[in-house]
Amino acid sequence: GIAVIVFKSEGDPAQVLAYDAFLEANKTNWLAREIRLYWKRVLKRVDLTSRSLVAIVEPGSCFAGTLAEIVFACDRSYMLVGQLNGGNRPPATIALSGANFGPYPMPNGITRLESRFLEDKKSLDAVHAKVGEMLDAQAAEKLGLVTFAFDDIDWDDEIRIFLEERASFSPDGLTGLEANLRFGGPETMESKIFARLTAWQNWIFQRPNAVGEEGALRR
């Protein structure tokens, strides 16, 4: 079965920011409103996915604005410092827009950045001050926007070790742990049902690799 879901992107981050600005400027239009509501629903489904999520930010990635929400929804994120040996693409960047600060709340009612910097207004303000800037790996790691930043010497090995490590665990047994980490802070009726109850009833208490005779939680 599937244990880990890896997110990658490819494109022009400046173009993504331009689309974000367009949607914001036209947010009262029915089509722009529907697009944003659809993205809101899709991102919530990512939040509630019962598998380990990892984002890989490499040269050529376009994790900016709305697409950067995918990085913030993941359990871990890895960003390459500089370029791959022999590569000719510019170094990876992450960029923020207003879309990261309100339009796409999680099931618990706060943004993914508010969840990441829970009750840490200073860090959240520092991140907000960088809206519109193309942040390289060192800057993103320093701000706390990614889990790890590695150069090309360690890159392949670190990604491989993480994927092998995560796949060696019971993906269903990890669901509760990951739900607790993803949904810190306030509880809403939505998060109580879909982030808590569903995780335990539909995955942990039902799945053979979690609670079966040889399941991870019965060893």
Residue ranges of predicted features:
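C-terminal alpha-helix plus adjacent terminal tail
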Residues: 1-54, 58-70, 77-86, 128-142, ...
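CoA-thioester-processing core
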Residues: 64-127
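Helix-capping/helix-break motifs at membrane-protein junctions
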Residues: 118, 151-152
